[in-house]
């Protein structure tokens, strides 16, 4: 996980001590064994371009849309990919509705970087007519519940949506 996202929540001395003691005792708050993974469910919606990922108690819904646009001058043969994240106020008490907060922006950047660096979306394949028409792909991720592994759940949802493009 990117260190900047982790730094948005500060641990108290007691919380740090609790975590260290739990790790030394092979205990997890949710009752899983140390090497046990969270249950994952991936669903693709009835509508094209929608998905839902549940990773343990974390719940992410996503939607991919596209429109034909003129390409950027410096990338005449490539379409575009944009990631937007939004936290539901019910996802976590620290998240506020309205304009995307720092955590939402950072999560979007992490997912965007992961998709680009893995080349999960070939932006050249989004070109319809060189210099004239390309696809602009937009992936919207809605965080409905944050029960841990948020970066993983968001990445899985975005990857699933990108495969639907």
Go through the PLM ranges and name each one.
Residues 152-165:
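Glycine- and Gly-Pro-enriched alpha-helical subdomains that act as flexible
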Residues 1-54:
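Short, Gly/Pro- and small/polar-rich lid/capping loops
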Residues 130-138:
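Short, conserved phosphate-binding/catalytic loop or strand-edge motifs used
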Residues 133, 145-154:
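Positively charged, low-complexity, intrinsically disordered RNA-binding extensions
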Residues 30, 122-124, 149:
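Poly-acidic low-complexity segments
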Residues 41-130:
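Glycine-rich, flexible beta-strand/loop modules in the N-terminal catalytic cores of phosphate-handling
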Residues 89-96, 141-149:
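A generic structural motif
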